[in-house]
Amino acid sequence: MHYNIILLVDGTLSLEQANQVEQKHQKLLEKATEFKSEYLGLKELAYPIKKQLSAHYYRWSFHGESNCTKEFKRAANINKQIIRELIINREKDYGYLGSVNPKKQQLSLQKLTKYNEIIASENNPDNPDAPVTSGLASVKPRLSRVEKQKERELEKWTVVHQSGNFDTVQINPYRPRIKRFLQNNQQTSQANNNQPRFQNQFKKGAKP
């Protein structure tokens, strides 16, 4: 099978140190043949990945068996100096198996788009140091539940300030949590009103 791999190595390392990391992981490819390695340069990332702002880019091309990248992927995932890797199996992703599987077609297209844009940025002589904005570094980091909530609140108040109408921000009574809260308040009020003490006070006109 024909493989292409894009490897991102920690940009704070010197070129010599990055080459050592790259060569160390080359040896983990089992029985790889026709191996070609190309250094694409030190590039700025679109956003921090593992607290790094830049990375050394490498492109590998080789042939091997279907499980030849298994050990490489395991080592790359636990090595902090490897920021990210993109593995493309040309035959599996773009061959017959990929052509009959819609999900694999979509995933393969995403991988190919990332791969082509990384190569295109390398082949741009006018601006070779331009940051990669839609390649491996373009995937938006996953937000936590609290961060998502803050993001929604920020979007809501942005709309309010732009429109200038603060009355448009209302509680949605159909949201499960708000609905339970309103029901509990209603039940509490009814229970208080049904107590004899409250009924007698209301009859006499006294304040509760």
From Swiss-Prot:
Residue stretches of biased makeup (Low complexity): 185-195
InterPro entries for this protein: Ribosomal_bS6, Ribosomal_bS6_CS, Ribosomal_bS6_sf, Ribosomal_S6_plastid/chlpt, Transl_elong_EF1B/ribsomal_bS6
Renumbered residue ranges of the record's region Disordered: 121-143, 185-208
Keywords: Ribonucleoprotein, Ribosomal protein, RNA-binding, rRNA-binding
Highest taxon above the source species: Bacteria
Keyword presence, Hydrolase: no
Listed GO MF terms: small ribosomal subunit rRNA binding; structural constituent of ribosome
Single GO BP term: translation
Record-linked HAMAP family: Ribosomal_bS6
Database matches in NCBIfam families: S6 (TIGR00166)
Function, as annotated: Binds together with bS18 to 16S ribosomal RNA.
Protein name: Small ribosomal subunit protein bS6
